[in-house]
Amino acid sequence: MILDAAFHGHKTNAEAFQELSDAAVDVKWAPNGVIYHQKTITVDDTTAAVGTGNLTPQYYSTSRDAWVLDTNPTDVAAIAATFDTDYTAPPSGRPPEATPAPNLIWSPTARASFLQHIDQAVQSVDVTSEELKDRAVLSALDKAARRGVNCRIVLTENPAWANAVAEVSAAGCSVHQFPDTGTGLYIHEKIILTDNTKLIIGSQNLTTTSLLENRELSLALDTETAPDVVAAVESTFDADYAAAPGP
């Protein structure tokens, strides 16, 4: 197991690290200088759970998150290989190069794939993210809305991205935001669904750090490879969009 140590990770994960070590689990701290934000659990090199949520039970009942069980052999092999590389690599200030696979979008090289998905949208783009701050993503959403793509975004309110919300709203995106009450639904899920057929889902928030610096992983799925997953994400997004207050 690799546990994040950067930002507030060391403090958050210290108790778990000690408990796992005491149980003879091979657990290792990620390098201090890099945020390891990837959320995966790989079992027997046959199945990888790829998620948007942290393994922190206090948030299970109030956070919107999702996990996808991936049994594609190429995906699972690449996820396992990248884990092995991360586990053994010496600290360098940047995550090692990940093992590529067609359905995987790795950070720190994720931004181009995210922009491509948005730029290729013809009819619609639906977005949830804990954060909305990356300049290039904002520009892509702005352009999509202005060319007539139906752009919908669901967030939890936060002053840190109020200007971003105002910008994409002015371009034509419809942004619905849940109030940050501490007890109501908190949007932590990270998805981009385009034309109700192509889905990015995983750990990347729409921030520059998340897309270009951290270790992160999202799946790139569609209605041919994972129709049930896409349908479930679409249905859940529609429900959250309807429930969250609009402008």
Identify what each model region corresponds to.
Residues M1-A48, G53, P57-T88, P95, ...:
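PLD/PLD-like phosphodiesterase catalytic module centered on the HKD motif
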Residues G93-L104:
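Long, charged amphipathic helices and adjacent flexible linkers at domain junctions
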Residues N103, S107, S129-E130:
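Glycine- and other small-residue-rich loops at beta-strand/loop junctions that grip anionic moieties
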Residues S107-I118:
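Glycine-/acidic-rich phosphate or pyrophosphate-binding loops and their flanking alpha/beta elements
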Residues A121:
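An anion/phosphate-binding loop that grips the pyrophosphate of nucleotide cofactors and donors
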